[in-house]
């Protein structure tokens, strides 16, 4: 995803934490907030408790980014959201990551239409 689709600054992360709503499942927590903008923005956080090595944390982030890239046409454009991985997320493969993200994003109301989970 392009940099314009990412939330990078700490102040922007904190704004979504403070003023947004949260939804969670077993593997991910999503904080989301409506905004007036041409496209959605996403921040991804994977802590050291999730994966003890940088390789594992980066792999989880790659899985999340790829899943979001595939879901991009169905994500509400007026939303900023943060995806925070929980400890159990390190057990997921790419398909499991996408399935769990679809589930939690449906709960948050971020997805515009129904998507079949493969």
UniProtKB/Swiss-Prot annotation:
Substrates-to-products reaction catalysed? Endonucleolytic cleavage of RNA, removing 5'-extranucleotides from tRNA precursor
EC category: hydrolase
Keyword Iron-sulfur recorded: no
Among the record's GO biological process terms, what is one? tRNA 5'-leader removal
Q: What is its EC number?
A: 3.1.26.5
Annotated InterPro entries = Ribosomal_Su5_D2-typ_SF (IPR020568), Ribsml_uS5_D2-typ_fold_subgr (IPR014721), RNase_P (IPR000100)
Example GO CC term: the record gives:
ribonuclease P complex
Any one Pfam family here would be: Ribonuclease_P
Which of UniProt's keywords are assigned here? Endonuclease, Hydrolase, Nuclease, RNA-binding, tRNA processing
**GO molecular function, one example?**
tRNA binding
Q: What does this protein do?
A: RNaseP catalyzes the removal of the 5'-leader sequence from pre-tRNA to produce the mature 5'-terminus. It can also cleave other RNA substrates such as 4.5S RNA. The protein component plays an auxiliary but essential role in vivo by binding to the 5'-leader sequence and broadening the substrate specificity of the ribozyme.
Its assembly, as annotated, is: Consists of a catalytic RNA component (M1 or rnpB) and a protein subunit.
Q: Which NCBIfam families does its entry note?
A: rnpA
The record's similarity note reads: Belongs to the RnpA family.
Name of the protein in question: Ribonuclease P protein component
């Amino acid at each position: 995803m392009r940099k314009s689709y990412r939330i990078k600054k700490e102040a922007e992360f904190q704004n979504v934490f403070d003023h947004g709503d949260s939804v969670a499942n077993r593997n991910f927590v999503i904080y989301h907030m409506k905004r007036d903008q041409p496209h959605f923005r996403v921040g991804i956080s994977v802590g050291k408790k999730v994966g003890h090595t940088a390789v594992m944390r980066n792999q989880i982030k790659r899985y999340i980014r790829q899943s979001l890239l595939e879901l991009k046409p169905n994500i509400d454009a007026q939303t900023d959201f943060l995806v925070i991985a929980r400890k159990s997320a390190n057990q997921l493969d790419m398909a499991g990551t996408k399935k769990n993200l679809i589930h939690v994003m449906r709960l948050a109301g971020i997805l515009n239409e129904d998507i079949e989970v493969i």
